[in-house]
Amino acid sequence: MAATDFVQEMRAVGERLLLKLQRLPQAEPVEIVAFSVIILFTATVLLLLLIACSCCCTHCCCPERRGRKVQVQPTPP
């Protein structure tokens, strides 16, 4: 039951976003700037999330862990 409610809510949000995009050419400059700021903020957050995930997955910030050191013993003559 909750899954269908979620799908319907996402569809409603998508339809509202599409309606806003269709009305954007006739919108006032303040609305265009506000919409642009929201889109830019969302894109920035998604980009930073992608960078953080890729750095975490590639371990570029962490030094490579080395195995245990083994002492070398001299060989008898």
Swiss-Prot record:
Keyword flag Membrane: yes
Subcellular location: Membrane
Pfam family, one: SMIM5_18_22
Membrane-topology descriptor: Single-pass membrane protein
Alphabetized UniProt keyword annotations: Membrane, Transmembrane, Transmembrane helix
Membrane-spanning parts: 32-52
Keyword Hydrolase among UniProt keywords: no
CC annotations in GO: membrane
Protein name: Small integral membrane protein 5
Species of origin: Homo sapiens
Lineage of source species: Eukaryota, Metazoa, Chordata, Craniata, Vertebrata
